[in-house]
Amino acid sequence: MVPPRHHPGAGRPGALSSSPPFRLRSSKFSGIALQDLRKAFKIRLQMVCVFIMNRMNSQSSGFTQRKRMALGIVILLLVDVIWVASSELTSYVFTQYNKPFFSTFAKTSMFVLYLLGFIVWKPWRQQCTRGFRGKHATFFADAEGYFAACTTDTTMNSSLSEPLYVPVKFHDLPSEKPENTNIDTEKIPKKSRVRFSNIMEIRQLPSSHALEAKLSRMSYPTVKEQESLLKTVGKLTATQVAKISFFFCFVWFLANFSYQEALSDTQVAIVNILSSTSGLFTLILAAMFPSNSGDRFTLSKLLAVILSIGGVVLVNLSGSEKSPGRNTIGSIWSLVGAMLYAVYIVMIKRKVDREDKLDIPMFFGFVGLFNLLLLWPGFFLLHYTGFEDFEFPNKVVLMCIVINGLIGTVLSEFLWLWGCFLTSSLIGTLALSLTIPLSIIADMCMQKVQFSWLFFAGAIPVFFSFFIATLLCHYNNWDPVMVGIRRIFAFICRKHRIQKVPEDSEQCESLIPMHGVSQEDGAS
């Protein structure tokens, strides 16, 4: 009978099978290692969560910007359709009632319908009450400072105060004694002491961050109430909107009057083509008076505008059924209207930096009110000078003017300004070029107008300039023309590489004496 085999180290102290002290220490070490592993896993999980949240926030912000751009493009396309239909209806009205000033005055005065919002919309009435603002005076002051800080392009380091160095007082905690003294403490690793600096740096955030700090310390219902107030304080007051409307009332009326005069002298397609030159004026004015980063001047934007201007020249050289003299007058009125439209959109975007800051219906409501109160003496001036005789239209023409004013002016101008705020001022003005193919089709179908090949050759570059400007603004002022010029310049003027020449002693010098090594090898 063969006796059972025993492990060679089974009877020695400290063996795995029979040593209780080692089993106790190993279990303690495994517990400590498990706790460290859990802490490391928890920290790593938190880091992953933070990384995912940051990625989601960055993607959501980019998605929001893409949604704003897409919504603005859709709105501008809808405005183009409305404008072409309105232009055709205006041309029909001018065949029976050629009064551009009366038509412009009547349609602009219809903006006053937006002021009915003071009756049906409570936030508008709250902006006119002093008690509402006085009740929350402290919050409004903090919020105004917050919005003022948001509009400025400053970094966090520049907004911090000067550093203040204060000595640090450390309080050493009493060392904790282990509960179980039977455990071998010699095997437990000692915690390393970390030495900190005796001086700490203190910087104070600016007062513009007081609103966020205050909201972070409030309860959830209070925060929701303050957020509703924040939406109100972020907008301009009724008095401020009225002041802006008073200035832009004259600019907008002259721009629209020039457009109406152009429609009375030439075809709709030619007027829309020449009106697209507002992109050039917008590019120049936006570079001089930028409202945001999207208005920055780039060489690619200039090339897109030049492409549009080249198409405009071809369109102007094309023949049409009307006399050349009236075409010239209509072209001049179109260019004047394009310049005034550029002044209008650039200045209003510089005055109001965000679309949620200005109540667009209230703005146009005050424009209609000031137009109705201040511009009526123009009838007497034009009548007695013989430029336009005053005559009241018949019922059919009056109905066409009312419908055209409500849809082609009141609704379309609101949508166009909203689309400009969602995209950029350059895209909003170049959106006028998209009325070209629609107006061509409308003139050919309704008025049987024949255009030469120069007209179509000029319409194509004007049409594509809009999409070029949209892509450039979408990709954060991407300037491929400047990038290409820089690469070509770098390729032509590149420096020749220094090549190794055998006569150069420094290049041939070796740090290791190879001849010595070869001699030793040869000797061996």
UniProtKB/Swiss-Prot annotation:
Residues 1-22 are annotated as: Disordered. Coiled coil: none annotated. The modification Phosphoserine is found at residue 207. Its main location: membrane. Keywords: Membrane, Phosphoprotein, Transmembrane, Transmembrane helix, Transport. GO terms for cellular component: membrane. Belongs to the SLC35F solute transporter family. This is Solute carrier family 35 member F5. It comes from Bos taurus (Bovine).
